[in-house]
Swiss-Prot record:
InterPro entries in UniProt: Liver_X_rcpt (IPR023257), NHR-like_dom_sf (IPR035500), Nucl_hrmn_rcpt_lig-bd (IPR000536), Nuclear_hormone_rcpt_NR1 (IPR050234), Nuclear_hrmn_rcpt (IPR001723), Znf_hrmn_rcpt (IPR001628), Znf_NHR/GATA (IPR013088)
Gene3D superfamilies: Erythroid Transcription Factor GATA-1, subunit A, Retinoid X Receptor
Sequence ranges assigned to domain NR LBD in this UniProt record: 207-445
Gene label: Nr1h3
GO molecular function: chromatin DNA binding; DNA-binding transcription activator activity, RNA polymerase II-specific; DNA-binding transcription factor activity; nuclear receptor activity; nuclear retinoid X receptor binding; nuclear steroid receptor activity; protein-containing complex binding; RNA polymerase II cis-regulatory region sequence-specific DNA binding
Low complexity composition bias: residue spans: 189-200
GO CC annotations on file: chromatin; cytoplasm; nucleolus; nucleus; receptor complex; RNA polymerase II transcription regulator complex
Organism encoding this protein: Rattus norvegicus
Tissue specificity: In adults it is expressed in spleen, pituitary, lung, liver, and fat. Weaker expression is observed in several other tissues.
Full protein name: Oxysterols receptor LXR-alpha
Length: 445
């Protein structure tokens, strides 16, 4: 979920945040479960002092997954394109194109073993980034494949493994649900009529299933784009004097820039929600400005690690309660964040359930300054019904799961009030927020 940031400019009017809603819809659903739309422009400023503007603009389509890195001219193996159609019959003595072990079949377009197949799939789903300690030129065999993951992944890509062939766990789950529904529909159509009343089975309509698939694809797109922004975030200070003024300012800048990335995700995800762009520009602004912090907290809870009691942003940055305090946040705000994240973690929600909860939170008709409340309520009802049907299928033996999930949205309203107090406290500490966050949270200097 991300939106784009323009380069720093000298001045930004108080209404600059409203420029973000001149757009045409981006349809992640049309791209399929494994494709998305990315913007390849510099989005993070070098400092938080410059003015930022957010924009909902149409984008050029590219691949969902990050581009494979540019490789030096290979000498040992060149990628071979395989013709479309069924895989050729295996003779039993074929070798893996990556490590030379015994191949089991064609996986992700390449003849490979089960080990390299699983390694490639895990690496793509996790967006893993490995580091070679030998200069990136390790010869790959059954021994070295365990020693150097970077060179192994490079060899997988060079052999021709295609990232777009990898389905995420959530897409696999949705695919199974779709197959189960088709089987149920077929069994219902051919089963003989009986006198007993038919059993009412929870079902997702084709429209609901398609919508959920679109939301999951949009989430993956936005998360990958935000991950690419991590190198532009002000680094966490490692200073001889951690209590120095410079170190405190750097920690605060680090957290505010992470918040900017999160706001980008929210806006970019919202504009891909079916029905959002059909609302008036004023209602789009009102919904996003008031739901932003609640959606940020939902996303934060997804990254909670109960073992270390820490929260990880952009896959590389992990923080505990003490780190939040060092960045200038109050314990009255820190503790509720971690408690909410812990309680959400106990629900063990998947990507589809999180995406639907976020959509329900965004389409809240009782937000201030919403004009067409009836239409917003209708849109929210669509997502509530989809979540109810999905949860009934995904948690058939837990009838309280659906109400527990909706109650989390009530808890978010309380946390939103605590956040307002935190923003006020930052102003008292003379800590200035970047223009984008000031506009989203209505902070007037």
């Amino acid at each position: 979920m991300s939106l784009w940031l323009e380069a720093a400019v000298p001045d930004v009017s108080p209404d600059s945040a409203t420029e973000l809603w001149k757009t045409e819809p981006q349809d992640a659903g049309d791209q399929g479960g494994n494709t998305c739309i990315l913007r390849e422009e510099a989005r993070m400023p070098q400092s938080t002092g410059g003015a930022l503007r957010i924009g909902l603009e149409s984008s050029e389509p590219t691949a969902l997954l990050p581009r494979a890195e540019t490789l030096p001219e290979p000498t040992e193996l060149r990628p071979q394109k395989r013709k479309k159609g069924p895989a050729p019959k295996m003779l039993g003595n074929e070798l893996c194109s990556v490590c030379g072990d015994k191949a089991s079949a064609f996986h992700y377009n390449v003849l490979s073993c089960e080990g390299c197949k699983g390694f490639f799939r895990r690496s793509v789903i996790k967006g893993a980034r490995y580091i070679c300690h030998s200069g990136g030129h390790c010869p790959m065999d059954t021994y070295m494949r365990r020693k150097c993951q970077e060179c192994r992944l490079r060899k997988c890509r060079h052999a021709g493994m295609r990232e777009e062939c990898v389905l995420s766990e959530e897409q696999i789950r949705l695919k199974k649900l779709k197959r189960q529904e088709e089987e149920q529909a077929q069994a219902t159509s051919v089963s003989p009529r009986v006198s007993s009343p038919p059993q009412v089975l929870p079902q997702l309509s084709p429209e609901q299933l398609g919508m959920i698939e679109k939301l999951v694809a949009a989430q993956q797109q936005c998360n990958r784009r935000s991950f690419s922004d991590r190198l532009r975030v002000t680094p966490w200070p490692i200073a001889p004097d951690p209590q120095s003024r410079e170190a405190r300012q750097q920690r605060f800048a680090h957290f505010t820039e992470l918040a900017i990335v999160s706001v980008q995700e929210i806006v970019d995800f919202a504009k891909q929600l079916p029905g959002f762009l059909q609302l008036s520009r004023e209602d789009q602004i009102a919904l996003l400005k008031t739901s932003a912090i609640e959606v940020m907290l939902l996303e934060t809870s997804r990254r909670y690690n109960p073992g270390s009691e820490s929260i990880t942003f952009l896959k590389d940055f992990s923080y505990n309660r003490e780190d939040f305090a060092k960045a200038g946040l109050q314990v009255e705000f820190i503790n509720p964040i971690f408690e909410f994240s812990r309680s959400m973690n106990e629900l063990q929600l998947n990507d589809a359930e999180f995406a639907l909860l976020i959509a329900i939170s965004i389409f809240s008709a009782d937000r201030p300054n919403v004009q067409d409340q009836l239409q917003v309520e209708r849109l929210q009802h669509t997502y509530v019904e989809a979540l109810h049907a999905y949860v009934s299928i995904n948690h058939p033996h837990d009838r309280l799961m659906f109400p527990r999930m909706l109650m989390k949205l009530v808890s978010l309203r309380t946390l939103s009030s605590v956040h307002s107090e935190q923003v006020f406290a930052l102003r008292l500490q003379d800590k200035k927020l970047p223009p984008l966050l000031s506009e989203i949270w209505d902070v007037h200097e």
